[in-house]
């Protein structure tokens, strides 16, 4: 979650410099739940609050930054998931994928994937929305890159270029 926040702050700062209006759901390491007596209830509240922000303005475009993890360490590379509810989501996902591939990961052959019902935020977003899994923290080499400030800047820039190519 620290990596997600570091990259998302860099992305928001960059997009602001390029003239985009940005809004981050969180700028520090804390959830955005408003209710719940246990972890599950707080997680549900957190997701509903995020979705409410996403869908609050039809002009919003959502890029949610995440990291991937798998039981085997051989997997690497950015992967982008997109909401099935807005056709612009697929275009945004593909543009980000191409940008990251061109600038950072020329050997990355991962394709964009339409989110299934298990990805609550994308399943319920009405605005263009993507989740960008920047890399695999279960891959030692990639995890080291993701922790590097310069690499984070490059990742944020590649994602920003992907957005700017569509919007």
What is the meaning of each model-derived region?
Residues 2-167:
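Active-site-proximal helix/loop segments of hydrolytic enzymes
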